[in-house]
Amino acid sequence: MRVGVALACTECKRRNYMTNKNKKNDPDRIELKKYCKWCKTQTVHKETK
């Protein structure tokens, strides 16, 4: 079952990306290194509600 999730920057707390994940394969919250246009650098983005 795939679910839509938002990814928020850990530096500025802005929600920059929407993605989906498979809850069966990734039951925990995902963390990805993505570009934040407000921080102007690559930062870790964590899954939010």
Curated annotation (Swiss-Prot):
InterPro entries on file: Ribosomal_bL33 (IPR001705), Ribosomal_bL33_CS (IPR018264), Ribosomal_bL33_sf (IPR038584), Ribosomal_zn-bd (IPR011332)
Keyword list, A-Z: Ribonucleoprotein, Ribosomal protein
One GO location term (cellular component): ribonucleoprotein complex
Highest taxon in the source lineage: Bacteria
Cysteine disulfide links: none
Signal sequence region: none
Pfam families: Ribosomal_L33 (PF00471)
GO MF assignments: structural constituent of ribosome
Gene Ontology BP term (one): translation
Family: Belongs to the bacterial ribosomal protein bL33 family.
PANTHER family in the record: 50S RIBOSOMAL PROTEIN L33, CHLOROPLASTIC (PTHR43168), LARGE RIBOSOMAL SUBUNIT PROTEIN BL33C (PTHR43168:SF2)
Protein name: Large ribosomal subunit protein bL33
Naturally occurring in which organism (per UniProt): Heliobacterium modesticaldum (strain ATCC 51547 / Ice1)
